[in-house]
C-alpha cells in the first residue's frame, strides 16, 4: 500500500500567513481541513499520514522533511497558502527541480487545484537554490515532495474567499490527483 505524508505547513508556534478575513493561519486552516484529504486518500486505498514539522522537534522546513522521512512516505505533500502584494493572486505548486516524479505529481495536483478554484494558474515552481521557498524541505526529503500554494489567501480577498468556499472540493481533487499520480506510475 502506498503511503502519503500530508504535512501541515508551519507549526503551532509559527502559524504562517493569516487569511485576509483573519479567521485562520496556514497551520490552523489546514489542521481543520487536512482530514478531508486523508479520508479521501484512504477511501481510494492509500495510507495517509497527517504530520507536522513540530513532531520532528522544530519549526523550520528541514524538520518537515525529517518528519516526512520518518513516516516512510512514497510521496510528501505540504499544505500552505500564499501571501504577497495585494494585486497578486492564483495557484502554484512547488517541487524539487531534479525530481521527475515530483514534477509529474506537481503537474497533476496543480491542474486539479486550478480546476476547482478557478484562480489564475501561476504554474509550477521548481526549487533549486537555497534562497528558494522551502529549499531544505525539498533538499532533505527522500521521496518526491511538493508544497501546495492553492491561493493567495493572506493577501487577496477573492483567493481567500474561493479557498474557503471550495475547500471540500479542493481536498477531494488533491486526493484524486495523487491517486492519478500513483496509477500512472512513477517516471
Language model region names:
Residues 46, 61, 122, 126-132:
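Conserved SGNH/GDSL esterase-like catalytic core that processes O-acyl groups on lipids
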Residues 38, 65, 111, 135, ...:
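Short glycine-/small-residue-rich flexible loop motifs, especially phosphate/cofactor-binding loops
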Residues 5-7, 11, 16-18, 23-24, ...:
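Active-site-adjacent mobile loop/cap segments within catalytic or ligand-binding domains
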Residues 35-46, 69-73, 110-118, 175, ...:
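Sec-exported extracytoplasmic/periplasmic mature domains
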Residues 30, 102, 106, 163-171:
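Short, charged, low-complexity patches
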Residues 2-91, 95-101:
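Catalytic-core regions of hydrolytic enzymes
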Residues 101-128:
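Active-site-adjacent substrate-binding region
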Amino acid at each position: 500500500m502506498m503511503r502519503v505524508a500530508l504535512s501541515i505547513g508551519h507549526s503551532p508556534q509559527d502559524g504562517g500567513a493569516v487569511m485576509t478575513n483573519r479567521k485562520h493561519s496556514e497551520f490552523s486552516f489546514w489542521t481543520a481541513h487536512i482530514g478531508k484529504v486523508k479520508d479521501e486518500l484512504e477511501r481510494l486505498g492509500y495510507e495517509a499520514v497527517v504530520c507536522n514539522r513540530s513532531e520532528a522537534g522544530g519549526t523550520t522546513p528541514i524538520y518537515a522533511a525529517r518528519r516526512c522521512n520518518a513516516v516512510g512516505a512514497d510521496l510528501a505533500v505540504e499544505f500552505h497558502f500564499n501571501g504577497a502584494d495585494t494585486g497578486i493572486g492564483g495557484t502554484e505548486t512547488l517541487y524539487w527541480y531534479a525530481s521527475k516524479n515530483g514534477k509529474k505529481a506537481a503537474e497533476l495536483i496543480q491542474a486539479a487545484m486550478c480546476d476547482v478554484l478557478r484562480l489564475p494558474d501561476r504554474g509550477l515552481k521548481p526549487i533549486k537554490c537555497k534562497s528558494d521557498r522551502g529549499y531544505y524541505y525539498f533538499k532533505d526529503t527522500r521521496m518526491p515532495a511538493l508544497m501546495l500554494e492553492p491561493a493567495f489567501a493572506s493577501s487577496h480577498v477573492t483567493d481567500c474567499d474561493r479557498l474557503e468556499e471550495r475547500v471540500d472540493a479542493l481536498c477531494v481533487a488533491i486526493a484524486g490527483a495523487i491517486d492519478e499520480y500513483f496509477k500512472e506510475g512513477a517516471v
